[in-house]
From Swiss-Prot:
It comes from Human cytomegalovirus (strain AD169) (HHV-5). This is Large structural phosphoprotein. The gene is UL32. InterPro entries: Herpes_UL11/UL32 (IPR010340). One of its GO terms (molecular function) is structural molecule activity. Participates in the last steps of viral maturation and release. Associates with nuclear capsids prior to DNA encapsidation and later preserves the integrity of nucleocapsids through secondary envelopment at the assembly compartment. Interacts with host CCNA2 and thereby blocks the onset of lytic gene expression to promote establishment of a quiescent state of infection in undifferentiated cells. GO terms for cellular component: host cell cytoplasmic vesicle; host cell nucleus; host cell perinuclear region of cytoplasm; host cell viral assembly compartment; viral tegument.
Length: 1048
């Protein structure tokens, strides 16, 4: 429940709210001890009635905050009882001179008990302290107070003055802030005093602490109730003379009696609940007629305006209300203040009665002339303020009227992106506009299918560069404002400045110079029709918005809102390679050889294994490493979403999935969308290792780590570093040659039935890890649920020069030259062997971060076949089981297969394809395996390892989407060839010549048909029978043209 204030500036409201929020941290929690906070209620510039309301609201919130932090003294009271027993025990054994008097005070200490009523705590403590002090003074032969009606003062016995002063300062701090008790660093066990005196001093300190807290709390509570009741009475008197409905309504609310905390909370709830009903009864300013809500003045406001506004109030009040008699004889009989003398604000800021000020000023020569001049100047200023407010109100009404008219206009006809459209007048496809290019270089874009000078719609406003001419304080004067149909359904709009796209720094959106953006958006309104998100000019809208974006967003995100996307535009260039992430090595396959050209993922039986830093993999149980997966149910079948598929194909720039598919996993799966950095040139190449000993050690370590649970180590804080931290195998600083970092590349050898030797490769550059998840709770062992176990790997990136911090959410890249094969040598063994034992399990995973770098072995139920992977969702038909399409064997493990790539023109990356996931089993459901950390409390993010060839141009990347079913984005006719189990890729591509045209999402098959009995040859493109990368590019272009023709 938030507080409501009237007529205050935003900084004043923030100051009031922050004061209440941090009340317990103030040295003094008394509100009246902070006069600056009370002045922020508008004491100097608001109407008296409004100031009283703001103060009432502040006191109600202050009282509620005090009771929320009501100090609990239960533990201190128990300590006090224990100390009372200790003093009585020592008192019974002490030889007092007057045993009868001492016996009475000892009986008081024995009977000291606290009842359920906290209001009696201070009285009980005070009686016990008086008796204890008398016993201590009797033991040291000090004089007692014997006067009638006086009691012995509660004081410390036989302590130094400096120690007593420190104790008094500590107790005074407790009295001013009873919520924060600072401990006293003082030793009260003095050797010069007896045990009875030391026990009494400790009892006195504890008792005075309880008394200060209780009495200061009761004092603040009484003060709050008194101030609230006082301001309620004043507001009732102020509103009594107002005959409007809202004033009477507020006055009836204020008549509720406030006697305790519950009644105060009830009054606060009533005031906040009906705030909009009575808010107009409180003027916004002392002398302003046109405020934010234009409150109407009542007849009793004239006197208040004259009194609070000073001389300036006479100019703002109409002529008939200006008093005609001098101030000396001014009568206040009818004033609602009942005899209160008016005050006037002087130049120096002090307040003086109006009669005295008038007598002092009338003695000066020429006073009336100066007063008249001053009033005239003030009148002119006030008139300007009123006129300015009227103009602003009129302009606002005009804008609202124009917006309503534009909403009633029919939407412009949707246009498809045309690759032949041009931005500048220098192209040769439209010769009739060459004469205009000399006059204006910024030629308006013509609609497709039209020609001539009249093809541009909207005149000067429809030009894509018209926003540059009308930016600033100007606004378009002619031409319709092309508002998308999706935006016209909203009731509230706001005018924003022209949006400049990222394709061209000086280009403004073609549909309108001033864009109309809705203030409120609901998820149900985002995708309610097939024609909702069509751009009026074919360009992707340029805003970081789920509805308006020209980016590729991860459509498998199970969260409600997508992650911040990366703006992308694409064209064909050099190939890139990404290995599958989130999978473990199968039983019949070890680590494979990394090749400089990407391996065709569709020629392999199933997904590629995940490269880990030490080569440790968890095998799959049984003789069938490729476990089949059942087909998708009806609600998850992409063939049952024809409407959404058609919409996604028609609007490729809106790659956002609002249709959350039902999943059984409890942990959300997200893909880290990333932006590559320019990789440094590597100094060494990947070296293949054929060491049988290293493989044997890895398999031995696997057998031991599979049986041992994963524990949080003491290096949790060191491991869970930020996105720029560098992690090595032994958690040490990387050396200059970086020969100790070992990576295990993936392999695709399904024909082997026995565990093969794991081949290791070395990288010549350090690896950095990217972590975007939360840090798990330290000191706790977290059990990973069976259904949410997902494998993850560490994203690796070469460090160029200094170890720069990588942007969170961006993938890291590895130069492709690191993956060039070298002649295998028995001497090139791993310089850091993995030792056996459960304690060294973290070394095999290269000291991964706790949350995002954990490697969890999925169980059999979590296996995702290629038919259910997000890339296979491109097919419109229902995915077939994994058994129906047996994979073609790979003959050469070191073969090179070319894959077409996409070059980003705006710093983004293209989604080319992803090897499907590999089923992994071998551990019990819900049990951790491998050398991972249990961090299932945070969402897991499958890592992405992108390998780039050595080039100075911008690189594209291959993104691995998590195995979550998503709706198809192709029409049935366009994806008939993609219904098999072959891996497909999705790319948002533009024209090879111009990257500023509209982008389309196309699907192409990475597994091209090859001759029977022959596998992919090294160096071949492996796409559509192409032998060179250029042929592969031509094949993809032909498929894009076929899809366009199919749509038309």
């Amino acid at each position: 429940m938030s507080l409501q204030f009237i007529g205050l500036q935003r900084r004043d409201v923030v100051a009031l709210v922050n004061f209440l929020r941090h009340l317990t941290q103030k040295p003094d929690v008394d509100l009246e001890a902070h006069p600056k906070i009370l002045k922020k209620c508008g004491e100097k510039r608001l109407h008296r009635r409004t100031v009283l309301f703001n103060e009432l609201m502040l006191w109600l919130g202050y009282y509620r905050e005090l009771r929320f932090h009501n100090p609990d003294l239960s533990s201190v009271l128990e300590e006090f009882e224990v100390r009372c027993v200790a003093v009585a025990r020592r008192g019974y054994t002490y030889p007092f001179g007057d045993r009868g008097k001492a016996r009475d005070h000892l009986a008081v200490l024995d009977r000291t008990e606290f009842d359920t009523d906290v209001r009696h705590d201070a009285e009980i403590v005070e009686r016990a302290l008086v008796s204890a002090v008398i016993l201590a003074k009797m033991s040291v032969r000090e004089t007692l107070v014997t006067a009638i009606g006086q009691t012995e003062p509660i004081a410390f016995v036989h302590l130094k003055d400096t120690e007593v002063q420190r104790i008094e300062e500590n107790l005074e701090g407790v009295r001013r802030n009873m919520f924060c008790v600072k401990p006293l660093d003082l030793n009260l066990d003095r050797h010069a005093n007896t045990a009875l005196v030391n026990a009494v001093n400790k009892l006195v300190y504890t008792g005075r602490l309880i008394m200060n807290v209780r009495r200061s709390w009761e004092e603040l509570e009484r003060k709050c109730l008194a101030r609230i009741q006082e301001r309620c009475k004043l507001l009732v008197k102020e509103l009594r003379m107002c005959l409007s409905f809202d004033s009477n309504y507020c006055r009836n609310i204020l008549k509720h009696a406030v006697e305790n905390g519950d009644s105060a909370d009830t009054l606060l709830e009533l005031l906040i609940e009906d705030f909009d009903i009575y808010v107009d009864s409180f003027p916004q300013s002392a002398h302003t007629f046109l405020g934010a809500r234009s409150p109407s003045l009542e007849f009793d406001d004239d006197a208040n305006l004259l009194s609070l506004g000073g001389g300036s109030a006479f100019s703002s009040v109409p002529k008939k209300h200006v008093p005609t008699q001098p101030l000396d004889g001014w009568s206040w009989i009818a004033s609602p203040w009942k005899g209160h003398k008016p005050f006037r604000f002087e130049a120096h800021g002090s307040l003086a009665p109006a009669a005295e000020a008038h007598a002092a000023r009338s003695a000066a020569v020429g006073y009336y002339d100066e007063e008249e001049k001053r009033r005239e100047r003030q009148k002119r200023v006030d008139d300007e303020v009123v006129q300015r407010e009227k103009q602003q109100l009129k302009a606002w009404e005009e804008r609202q009227q124009n917006l309503q008219q534009r909403q009633q206009q029919p939407p412009p006809p949707a246009r498809k992106p045309s690759a032949s459209r041009r931005l500048f007048g220098s192209s040769a496809d439209e010769d009739d506009d060459d004469d205009d290019d000399e006059k204006n270089i910024f030629t308006p874009i013509k609609k497709p299918g039209t020609s001539g000078k009249g093809a541009a719609s909207g005149g000067g406003v429809s030009s894509i560069f018209s926003g540059l001419l009308s930016s600033g304080s100007q606004k378009p004067t002619s031409g319709p404002l092309n508002i998308p149909q999706q935006q016209q359904r909203h009731a509230a709009f706001s005018l924003v400045s022209p949006q400049v796209t990222k394709a061209s720094p000086g280009r403004v959106r073609r549909d309108s110079a001033w864009d109309v953006r809705p203030l409120t958006e609901t998820r149900g309104d985002l995708f309610s029709g097939d024609e909702d998100s069509d751009s009026s000019d074919g360009y992707p809208p340029n805003r970081q918005d789920p509805r308006f974006t020209d980016t590729l967003v991860d459509i498998t995100d199970t969260e409600t809102s997508a992650k911040p996307p990366v703006t992308t535009a694409y064209k064909f260039e050099q190939p890139t390679l990404t290995f599958g992430a989130g999978v473990n090595v199968p039983a019949g396959a070890g680590a494979a050889i990394l090749t400089p050209t990407p391996v065709n993922p569709s020629t392999a039986p199933a997904p590629a294994p995940t490269p880990t830093f030490a080569g440790t993999q968890t095998p799959v149980n049984g003789n069938s490493p490729w476990a089949p997966t059942a087909p998708l149910p009806g609600d998850m079948n992409p063939a049952n979403w024809p409407r959404e598929r058609a919409w996604a194909l028609k609007n490729p720039h809106l790659a956002y999935n609002p249709f959350r598919m039902p999943t059984t996993s409890t942990a959300s799966q997200n893909t880290v969308s990333t932006t590559p950095r320019r990789p440094s040139t590597p100094r060494a190449a990947v070296t293949q290792t054929a060491s049988r000993d290293a493989a044997d050690e890895v398999w031995a370590l696997r057998d031991q780590t599979a049986e041992s649970p994963v524990e949080d180590s003491e290096e949790e804080d060191d491991d869970s570093s930020d996105t720029g931290s560098v992690v090595s195998l032994g958690h040490t600083t990387p050396s200059s040659d970086y020969n100790n970092d070992v990576i295990s590349p993936p392999s695709q050898t399904p024909e082997q039935s026995t565990p093969s030797r794991i081949r290791k490769a070395k990288l010549s550059s350090p690896m950095t890890t990217t972590s975007t998840s939360q840090k798990p709770v330290l000191g706790k062992r977290v059990a990973t649920p069976h259904a949410s176990a997902r494998a993850q790997t560490v994203t690796s990136t070469p460090v160029q020069g200094r170890l720069e911090k990588q942007v969170s959410g961006t993938p890291s890249t590895v130069p492709a030259t690191l993956l060039q094969p070298q002649p295998a040598s028995s001497k090139t063994t791993s310089s850091r062997n993995v030792t056996s034992g459960a304690g060294t399990s973290s070394a095999s995973s290269a000291r991964q971060p706790s949350a995002s770098a954990s490697v969890l072995s999925p169980t059999e139920d979590d296996v995702v076949s290629p038919a259910t992977s997000p890339l296979s969702m491109l097919s419109s038909a229902s995915p077939s089981p994994a058994k129906s399409a047996p994979p073609s064997p790979v003959k050469g493990r070191g073969s090179r297969v070319g894959v077409p790539s996409l070059k980003p023109t705006l710093g983004g990356k293209a989604v080319v394809g992803r090897p499907p996931s590999v089923p992994v089993s071998g551990s019990a459901p819900g049990r951790l395996s491998g050398s991972s950390r249990a961090a299932s409390t945070t969402p897991t993010y499958p890592a992405v390892t992108t390998v780039y060839p050595p080039s100075s141009t911008a690189k594209s990347s291959v993104s691995n989407a998590p195995p979550v079913a998503s709706p198809s984005i192709l029409k049935p006719g366009a994806s008939a060839a993609l219904q098999s189990r072959r891996s497909t890729g999705t790319a948002a591509v533009g024209s090879p010549v111009k990257s500023t045209t509209g982008m389309k999402t196309v699907a192409f098959d990475l597994s091209s048909p090859q001759k029977s009995g022959t596998g992919p040859q090294p160096g071949s493109a492996g796409m559509g029978g192409a032998k060179t990368p250029s042929d592969a590019v031509q094949n993809i272009l032909q498929k894009i043209e076929k899809i366009k023709n199919t749509e038309e």
